[in-house]
Structure formats: structure tokens, C-alpha cells
Regions:
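Short Gly/charged-rich anion-binding patches and loops
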Residues: 6-7, 70
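Structural/interface elements that position substrates and couple domains in central-metabolism enzymes
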Residues: 1-5
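NAD(P)-dependent Rossmann-like dehydrogenase/reductase catalytic/cofactor-binding core
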Residues: 13-14, 19-120
Length: 120
């Protein structure tokens, strides 16, 4: 949680966005996705190959190890790319991908109803 707050404070401090803007973006974007899927589910839906590509250059800026995450890279090398390959952090083989997509969309809709459409 503090890592997100640290970055949010930096965005506000450099004048890139207001406090309200940052809260709105996180609630409607990352917050909504993480509430429905968690970080591993979000990565599976986004494609582990995409996250691994980002991992190769961005992790060095965020972590003292100066290299990307080994587990993620090994999964991509093994063809485990998430939903699009049928296997990632979770199993999406057979009909499981379609079921996961339907469930994700259902959760997004329910969360949006609660957060944005039930205001009194």
C-alpha cells in the first residue's frame, strides 16, 4: 500500500495531477481491476509476456537487484503467458478462460455499480 501512496505523492508533488485526479484514476483503473482480480490475475489478463517485457527494464529502476523477476521470466520462457496461452499464474485451459473472462466482467460491473452508480 505504501508503494502506491509513495508514487501517488510523487505524481502530485511534481504537479502531474491533483490529489483528486490520482484518487479518481486509481479507483476507476488499477483499484477496480485489483479488487476484482488481484495482482496475479491482472498480470494473467494483461499477458505475462507484456509484463515480463516491462519487468526487464522497469524492475531495475524499482528494485536494488537491478534485474527483472526471475519467476516471471521463466514462466514466459515456458510459454505460460496468462489467459492468452491457457496458463499463467492460474489455469485457463479449456473453457476456463471464457469462464474467467465472464467472472471478471461480472465483478467489474458489480464493483462499478457499488462505487459509481448507487450514489444517493
Amino acid at each position: 500500500q505504501f508503494a502506491v501512496l509513495r508514487e501517488a505523492l510523487h505524481i502530485v508533488d511534481i504537479g502531474a495531477a491533483t490529489i483528486e485526479d490520482v484518487d479518481t484514476v486509481l479507483k476507476a483503473g488499477m483499484g477496480l481491476r485489483y479488487a476484482a482480480l488481484g495482482p496475479f490475475g491482472v498480470a494473467d489478463f494483461g499477458g505475462l509476456d507484456t509484463f515480463d517485457h516491462i519487468n526487464t527494464y522497469l524492475n531495475a529502476e524499482l528494485d536494488d537487484s537491478k534485474v527483472g523477476n526471475k519467476r516471471l521470466h521463466e514462466m514466459v520462457e515456458a510459454g505460460k503467458l496468462g489467459v492468452k496461452s491457457g496458463q499463467g499464474f492460474y489455469d485457463y485451459s479449456g473453457d476456463k478462460a471464457d469462464e474467467a473472462i465472464r467472472e471478471r466482467d461480472r465483478m467489474y460491473i458489480e464493483l462499478a455499480k457499488v462505487l459509481y452508480f448507487n450514489k444517493k
